[in-house]
UniProtKB/Swiss-Prot annotation:
The keyword Protein transport applies. Residues 51-76, 143-159, 214-217, 273-297 are lumenal. Residues 334-347 have a biased composition (Basic residues). This is Translocating chain-associated membrane protein 1. Residues 333-374 are annotated as: Disordered. It is a multi-pass membrane protein. Coiled coil: none annotated. It is found in: Endoplasmic reticulum membrane.
Length: 374
């Protein structure tokens, strides 16, 4: 992300610079149109599809919970409209954090262009990872994921979700979709775009896969685990920009990164390879959302393993690069010995002149003049 220079002149309407400077205001107006649509009966039915979660199912109260009935949700095609609206919300929040927090810090710290771009990236991602990690942990605790790990595969397919779980997934999809237009809004360098596209695409692929295959329990646990490790990395990088001697956070992150990859593989194999493989119902059924067949299980495990291997490969390259930079910084400079020339002509040239500059020769030195006078 390049530094945005503010100019006193107003750019032409709907020009490239106009869209970059005012994209948050334009998106805010679009979001307000959906909210205003809720106020009128004619447009309320269409607007509510974008704003509220769809596919609500009311489960009647059981004997254990006779006081109230449970409202659960499943997914459908209308979720695309909801994701679109909250993608607009994510763009607005992104602009607020950028203008009122990160830009003010950048003006105080006077970062270079490279550090400015990385600082903005880590600032935005650390805020998102912290929020998503806290929210996901709250869901895990409230729905007894921690006290009963078998909930990851028991009673599959998990085609019904609580409001918090579905809203969490909708928000995740909306956030990572908003990252595509942000590449344009933040003037991302061309050489950084392929890396960003791979990064965003992997998130969308795995989040959408867990959501559509009704593996939302496993996906939620893995996301919280991954987000915590990523939050530690980006918050450490923010501290590093203010003090380049800061290395403790990176050391802790390196350990937790490896442990996170290991835990991800263990939980995935335990859930998909053992838990779902021993389930009684192993027939493909789109109506009930049951995808517990051998081909799907192999595809899920393969995608997770390949992604973890790719992340470890990037991690090892990153650590090797840091180690080389640290070694080069710590290595003492090599002292060059002056070359000793042989022969009378070289000695005479050295005495009488160096690089064309005339110097005093041996006969004119104070010591030799003293010997002659004696």
């Amino acid at each position: 992300m390049a530094i945005r220079k503010k100019s006193n002149k107003n750019p032409p309407l709907l020009s490239h610079e106009f869209l970059l400077q005012n994209h948050a205001d334009i998106v805010s107006c679009l979001a307000m149109l959906f909210l205003l649509g809720l106020m009128f009966e004619v447009t309320a039915k269409g607007a509510i599809i974008f704003v509220a979660l769809q596919y609500n199912v009311t489960r009647p109260a059981t004997e254990e919970q006779a006081t109230e009935s449970a409202s659960l949700y499943h997914y459908g095609i209308k979720d695309l409209a909801t994701v679109l609206f909250y993608m607009l919300v994510a763009i607005i929040i992104h602009a607020i954090i950028q203008e009122y927090v990160l830009d003010k810090i950048n003006r105080r710290m006077h970062f270079s262009k490279t550090k400015h771009s990385k600082f903005n990236e880590s600032g935005q991602l650390s805020a998102f990872y912290l929020f998503a990690c806290v929210w996901g942990t709250f869901i895990l605790i409230s729905e007894n994921y921690i006290s009963d790990p078998t909930i990851l595969w028991r009673a599959y397919p998990h085609n019904l979700m609580t409001f918090q779980t579905k809203f969490f997934y909708i928000s995740q999809l909306a956030y990572w979709l908003h990252a595509f237009p942000e590449l344009y809004f933040q003037k991302t360098k061309k050489e950084d775009i392929p890396r960003q596209l791979v990064y965003i695409g992997l998130y969308l692929f795995h989040i959408a896969g867990a959501y559509l295959l009704n593996l939302n329990h496993l996906g939620l646990v893995l996301l919280v685990l991954h987000y915590f490790v990523e939050f530690l990395f980006h918050i450490s990088r923010l501290f590093y920009f203010s003090d380049e001697k800061y290395q403790k956070g990176f050391s802790l992150w390196a350990v937790l990164f490896v442990l996170g990859r290991l835990l991800t593989l263990i939980l995935s194999v335990l859930t998909v390879g053992f838990g779902l493989a021993r389930a009684e119902n192993q027939k493909l059924d789109f109506s009930t959302g049951n995808f517990n067949v051998l081909a799907v299980r192999i595809a899920v495990l393969a995608s997770i393993c390949i992604t973890q291997a790719f992340m470890m490969w990037k991690f090892i390259n990153f650590q090797l690069r840091r180690w080389r930079e640290h070694s080069a910084f710590q290595a003492p400079p090599v002292k060059r010995k002056p070359a000793v020339t042989k022969g009378r002509s070289s000695r005479k040239g050295t005495e009488n002149g160096v690089n064309g500059t005339v110097t005093s020769n041996g006969a004119d030195s104070p010591r030799n003049r003293k010997e002659k006078s004696s």
